């Protein structure tokens, strides 16, 4: 059986590892480096180059050099090179092929299976895209694992007998995740996760790029961002300065011959201090704190409950980031793991678990966002709540909204808002051939099944006929992860507005149901109810219909009008019930009187006398 490798497919850098002798070994690439830049380039001759060689030639070949493709996974984004379009999956597959090749060179055998990591906040579409990229690269992706969870595995592999609660703070090149885990007795259980998939080292670089470009524009009147070659040089200089400022107090950015004007060549020479860098990027550092607070709240923990803090991703080397985490949690972050390599190491440990090489280790991850379907009134009805342990399977019974409805549309949603249109559509499908019946009679069981990779399967089954329709969610969300993180924030900010909307929808649905049931029962009762009582109820129904048809009516007004109908109808029902009970008692009394009749002495005596005479 071949080895299963562990891959950290990163935004800026990627890494591959394998489990040997019970320990994760990072595999060096063909250039001798332990991490590989996630860069793909196409030369003038059509040759495809990956990693460090691709990064080195980016200045002179900016148009055909692709970076940070991970940020486009799960979208319809295309890269056009020499008239050919490439999807993010294809570009990612090129990087994976490089990592696969390096692993094969190290192991001396063909590699066909892998565990690949993704940000914890990746959507279903992005996870599916990652699996597709692996397949294009010739890899059977045995498991998709969340990056913070993989880091926790690397950290806790030698601490299986210890009980700890850890916070993983993962700030990479393009994404940010924070996860809270509890480890003990060989179990790694994710308690909560939060994040922002549009926040990472690239954003820090961009701020430095803009600062340098603006400073140069002030001095020379030229915007370097309009020159692709100059912009690429700025990008490289900004990244280098950012890294230098993690260990020094100042960095000199010196780019001779950065551009030229009619006056001659122009040079860029700017000193950037750590203090200035921290001032420029303070907003980005602060952005990492909100998801951290959310994760702690969702886990039901306080900062004092955290035993260890793991810093993962190259961007956590920034001193201001480390200081912010230390200040918020109140303890020094753990420095015992390599932030660039621990995710791949953890992936290789999970690969070892799947291969049977690692015993007594159980990983319990969670789904980052709630899943549900659209129900009557555009309401998002959640079936699986966010931070539910996966794999999981949950079902809920629904019914039809109209009489003789023979089909139902299942609109699958992901998000935290109350209204369907405020959430992300994952897919749609239809369950047909439902036997005609009154509304509310058919029983439609909707089941959500999330596998260990976080991939969603949804089915709808008519319990009456056994007919079933299934869908594996593979749809493209066309949505940035910043928008997904925004959904949770919006849900908190708009909680009251959402609550009012939902209450009105529920009141509207209750009103419709009350009207339907009351009118139906009145028709069935016919002349059993007096005309005066019937008119009284019909007037209350008419009043309720008027309120229901008023767009400006509040939930309270709908409830009040609904209660009026129910009160009047219940009063009549009670009177009818009492009348029926009295009639029943009277009938029983008459029957009892008849039963007592044969016990009359004369009758009994006569019967006995006849018998005696015969004898």
UniProtKB/Swiss-Prot annotation:
Residues 597-609 have a biased composition (Basic and acidic residues). Induction: By stress conditions e.g. heat shock. Residues 573-615 are annotated as: Disordered. GO terms for molecular function: ATP binding; ATP-dependent protein folding chaperone; unfolded protein binding. Keywords: ATP-binding, Chaperone, Nucleotide-binding, Phosphoprotein, Stress response. CDD domains: ASKHA_NBD_HSP70_DnaK-like. It comes from the Bacteria. InterPro entries: ATPase_NBD, Chaperone_DnaK, Heat_shock_70_CS, HSP70_C_sf, HSP70_peptide-bd_sf, Hsp_70_fam. SUPFAM superfamilies: Actin-like ATPase domain, Heat shock protein 70kD (HSP70), C-terminal subdomain, Heat shock protein 70kD (HSP70), peptide-binding domain. Residues 580-594 have a biased composition (Low complexity). The modification Phosphothreonine is found at residue 175. PANTHER family: HEAT SHOCK PROTEIN 70KDA. Acts as a chaperone. NCBIfam families: PRK00290.1, prok_dnaK. Belongs to the heat shock protein 70 family. This is Chaperone protein DnaK. It comes from Clostridioides difficile (strain 630).
